[in-house]
Curated annotation (Swiss-Prot):
InterPro entries: MOCS3/Uba4 (IPR028885), Rhodanese-like_dom (IPR001763), Rhodanese-like_dom_sf (IPR036873), ThiF/MoeB/HesA (IPR045886), ThiF_NAD_FAD-bd (IPR000594), Ubiquitin-activating_enz (IPR035985). Pfam families: Rhodanese, ThiF. This is Adenylyltransferase and sulfurtransferase UBA4. It is found in: Cytoplasm, Cytosol. In the N-terminal section; belongs to the HesA/MoeB/ThiF family. UBA4 subfamily. The keyword Cytoplasm applies. Its cofactor is Zn(2+). Pathway: tRNA modification; 5-methoxycarbonylmethyl-2-thiouridine-tRNA biosynthesis. One of its GO terms (molecular function) is URM1 activating enzyme activity. Keywords: ATP-binding, Cytoplasm, Metal-binding, Multifunctional enzyme, Nucleotide-binding, Nucleotidyltransferase, Transferase, tRNA processing, Ubl conjugation pathway, Zinc. Binds 1 zinc ion per subunit.
Amino acid sequence: MDLHELERLRAENEQLKAELASKQHQIKQNDIKSYKGLSFEEHRRYGRQMIVSEFGSLTSQLKLKQCKTLVVGAGGLGCPSLMYLVGAGVGTIGIVDDDLVDETNLHRQVLHSTTSVGRLKCESAKSYLQELNPNVNIITYPVRLSNKNAFEIFADFDLVLDCTDSPASRYLINDVAVYFNIPVVSGSGLRTEGQLSVFNYENGPCYRCFYPDPPAANSVTSCSEGGVLGPVIGLLGTAMAVEAIKVITGFYHNTFKPFLTMYSAYPQQTFRVFKMRGKQKTCLCNHITRQAIESIDYSEFCGTLGPVNLLSHDQRISVHDYNSVRNSDHVLLDVRPKEQFEVSSFPGAVNIPWDSVLSKTTNIDKIDQLQLPPKSPIYVVCRYGNDSQLATKKLLDMGWNNVKDIKGGVSRWYSEVDQNIPFY
């Protein structure tokens, strides 16, 4: 039996133990004394939040217990949101996520553990959450949300948390939520910053009212490309849970005003709250239909950034071909940001970042100042093979003839040639 099989069996055993504990707890609950709709155990469990005046006492706790909340995405935002909503006693929680737990998730997606790697995120989350609070009914949807399955999923819920990281998902979640008149708590985060809002609530604006047009595909940076500080995304997910509790308990009733909260972790932590415009008369949300939603190609609407192909075949080299010339006389130019270069780099590589240096260099004199030997072959590498093409083209356009791009970058080198280097 290999290590992966052992970890799978261990994770399966933990899930079965959690499900058994939940069933046993439910059986006990049938025989436990209750008072005004909550068992004595629930009174003790939630007592410290029920005595907070802003929360709303027993009435608000019962609203949480009766609420059905759907969380789309069990990643960096979804994990803390789920932990605190389940801990707070939301009665039913749905989790939509078809992704698998990966080692690169663990620094920020704190519902998952090392033994969860390879498991469905929604099932890994369920195992943890059932142990956290067996009073909560947790439903998992291990599917990729689409305009074909979203209607059946959303129909049973009172509130949605958008914990996704792509514009296409955000517009889809918004449109289906508007169709069912379900409020949406939406958040996002990248690097050291993030934001959150509440949409489609108290006759307020929807996501489209704020953002009628999607961002350009080449302007959207993912966590894998731009990075993210774990506590930053955790703080934003926790703040989303706070907003969800306020919506569920009616804190904003008749007083809600559209807002956008911006968070920045560096240099000093700051929260800024901006008043936003209300519902727009020209927005699609005023006349949305199921037929219209099902007819939209959300990926096409938001644009997809396909592979960059700026160079001819003879201006590029595969990772295998580069491996065969690696010991010959040449210059390896690594154009990744210096932070990535420091994490993992090839011995002898020269780091001249594309974003901060090469892309801003406008004449050949400045290129000369970079001290690249013009007669030696130059091979250009980046993380995935996109920025390296831009850098190669620029060098070729400015007079360097013996320059080639390494296709697929460090990522492909790691997957196809050599795994004895750190990868991130």
